[in-house]
Each structure stands twice: as structure tokens, then as C-alpha cells.
Amino acid sequence: MIDLTSEVHITRLYNAINSARNGMRPFRENRTSMLREYVGRNYNGNGSDHEVIVNLIAQTADVYTIGLASTNPKVTITTDNKELISFADRFRVGINNQIKEMRFSETLQHIVLDSLFGLGISKTHLAATEPIQLEDDIWADIGTIYVSRISIDDFVMDLSAKEVRRCKFMADEYRVSWEDCKNHENFDKQILQKMSPTSKNDRTESQANDISAGYITDDDEYEPMVDLIDIWLPELKAIATFPKHMQSKPLAVLPWDGAEGGCYDLLSFSDVPDNVLPSSPMSNLKAL
């Protein structure tokens, strides 16, 4: 089992993350190539290098996205206990309202679209909130649920596993305000003292976002930013947050008490035996 206080184990973890990131590069490059076909030739000058008369990729993406994620899902909560029927109905309304408030249908549409080009990835977040009064004498601390879409450009997973459920790690990389990072109450202050803002130029490969953003630059960021990485470790049932560009002990370790599979959920259409990364429907249409 990995020990997050051991420098040897942390070095191995960073090496495994870097190896997996390099191993996923061809998949990201193929996805970017398919996205160029998806947007066509007239998208910011960075789309397809040839005229696309009948865009089968775009048409297929529209049909699947509308068909699979056109609206918010709804939950139904029932009980055999007559005394809890009223509570169950209130709970149902509360959850459905929460799903609507966090615009889950929009997130789901993006995840479905991602899956058509390779892999759709969602990340579940849970933040504590003040207790909510349901009845005169009943309070519930349900927390604030949030689901975000993770781009495969920012995602890393254990490629040595033959099944997703056997992956020893999954991770997502993201940029946050350096000011917010420094002032985060749960981050290790000793590690923060060794950190500094980082540049987007620190990454070594292009991303799909560059199709619209153009050249990689920090001029579009009005404040200093820093790159972090959240790593889901099934053995520890925890999420560890590390600096991306500086090997160190974790800034924070958050125990996970949610679903058994962890905070990430993956959606794919064309799984490949003995491989955790799938093929994609769009790869079969690209040649057409």
C-alpha cells in the first residue's frame, strides 16, 4: 500500500503519473485531430485543413448528444414506512432541485460529447453545508453535491490495468488562482512556502483547447495561477492533492466516503479488451 509520507513512494507515484500521461498522448492527439474535423474548416482557422461538405461527425454528435442528454435526470424516492412518505417526497423534490440548480444536463451533454470522441469523464465533489431544516424538529446536513466534466487533456489514469476498476490511480490536473491556493485553509503551509505560480507554457504538448485559444500564453490570465493535481488512490480510499510541477508530499489528503469506485465516473461506447482506454465512434467516421 502506498505511503504518502514516504519520499520513495511519492517519487514512484509521480513517475507513474508522468508515464501514464505520456502513454495517453496518442489518444489525446487523435481526439484533437477528430475535433478539428468536427468543427470544420471555418472555425478560427485552426479546424480541419480541408473543406468538409457533409460533416458526418458533427451530425452524429448532435444526434447522440440530444438523444442521450437532452434534459436533467430525475430521481424517485419511495418508502414502505407510511410515517416517512412525506419526508421521502420532500427529499425527492430537494434532490431534483439540486440537480437543476447545478445545471447537470449541461454537464451531462458535455460528457456524452466527450465519450463520442474517446472518453467522457465526470468528477463528483461534495462540500459541507449548514444543516437544512426539513420539518419543525428535523434537520438534515446533506452537503452540497456538484458534478464537473473533466477533459481527457487534463486526465491521467493507470494504463497498466486491464480493467478500469483495477486502476491504482486516476487523476485530474487543473489551474487555480495562486492567491486562493495560498489561502486555502486545508493546504499544508510548509509545502505552500516552497511553491510559486506556474505558467501554461510548462506543459509539453498541445491541447484541444488550443483550437480556439490559439497559441499557448498566459496573457489571457489576469492573475497568477498555479497547476495542481488531484489523485484518487483506491487503496487509501482518499483523494490527494499535489503540486503538479513540484514533487512534494501532498498539500492535502481528503478521505473519500462516497461511491466505491471513487470520485471519477467514465463513459465510453467502444471498449477495447484488456485496455482501460476505449476506441471511439468518431474514429470510425473520420475516414468518411
Regions of interest found by a model, annotated:
Residues 1-263, 271:
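Extended, helix-rich architectural segments
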Residues 262-263, 267-288:
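Structured mid-domain segments that build the active-site/substrate or prosthetic-cofactor binding neighborhood
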